[in-house]
Design a protein with these regions (language model features):
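Bacterial N-terminal signal peptides
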Residues: 11-21
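Electrostatic cytochrome c docking/interface patches
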Residues: 23-46, 137-146
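Periplasmic/extracellular electron-transfer cofactor-ligation site
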Residues: 37-39, 44-74, 99-107, 130-137
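Bacterial N-terminal signal peptides that target proteins for export
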Residues: 2-11
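Short glycine/proline- and charge-enriched loop/turn segments
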Residues: 27-30, 70-78
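Sequence context surrounding c-type heme c attachment/ligation sites in exported
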Residues: 41-52, 88-94, 117, 140
Length: 146
């Protein structure tokens, strides 16, 4: 049985397509940054479980983080925008979390076998959400999204 295509049928199809188009949109970003609110929420939980013991609950780092310790390593730096994390592009931040800080003179273990790429991006989104707008913009200006 063939149904005639009427203006009403076409209108219903177009309306259905328009409504479905909105279903595939991605989540909004946080203040125009590269990450979403859900990434920050996931990252906050992951940070608490994997990073806060050394870097502090608010990613504030340790005192004298720029001074070489007696063991020959640097203490955990702040990741909240007050340290040097913003000097590194996203790829470099991911690599540091995957490989750890030992190659750079620190003692942080690598998390490549424990955290997925999505987990690592969520961690970064959490501590970057602590960065003031001026710090985030300076990071972008340095090519942070490379």
């Amino acid at each position: 049985m063939n149904m005639p295509i009427t203006n009403r049928t076409v209108a219903a199809l177009l309306l259905s397509m328009a409504l479905l188009t909105g279903c595939g949109e991605t989540e909004a970003t946080v203040d125009g940054r590269w990450y979403s609110p859900s990434q920050v929420a996931t990252g906050k939980a992951l940070f608490a479980d994997n990073c806060a013991e050394c870097h502090g609950a608010s990613a504030q780092g340790t005192q004298n983080w720029q001074t070489l310790g007696a063991d020959g390593t640097y203490p955990p730096p702040p990741l909240n925008g007050l340290g040097h994390a913003w000097h590194h592009p996203l790829k470099g931040l991911k690599r540091s979390i995957q490989q750890g800080g030992v190659p750079l003179g620190g003692s942080m273990p690598g998390f490549a076998g424990q955290l997925s790429d999505a987990d690592i991006e969520a961690l970064i989104s959490f501590f970057q959400s602590q960065w003031p707008t001026t710090t985030y913009q300076a990071w972008l200006d340095r090519g942070g999204l490379r």
